[in-house]
Amino acid sequence: MCDTKVRIVGISKVPTQLPNSAVTGMIGMSGKCTGFMTLNLPERVALLSVSGLLQDEFVKLNPQVIDGVGELTNIIAGGLETKMYNTPWMIANITIPSVILGSNYQISYAKGIEYCSVSFEVEDPETLSIQDRVFMVNTSLMQV
């Protein structure tokens, strides 16, 4: 979809955050569970992903890229909603995505939250640093 090849490089049930996550998409979810999902992207991955999604080239963060990260967050949340249908974790509603710029923030998690983080590496021969190729999708959900 984004003209980008990725592979899973890690899964964790412990809350984690990328230290160089320049852009974070966040979306609320509710249904048989309640919580949120985040998409943490280094700037390079955000630019590559949105460039592929919109079939245009972006070299710096701008309103289109920020909006594109929100749309990617929405697409992933919609996929989770579909996959979790008719399970104890069924999601009936998702909110409008929000996008956080910068990495200097912390998220506090309520007691009883079930957390899952999946790390992906983007195949990008032009990017040497692993920190600029890895992004994360995180879910924090509690059954209601």
Feature-to-residue mapping (PLM):
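N-terminal auxiliary interaction/assembly segments of multi-subunit proteins
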Residues: 1-144
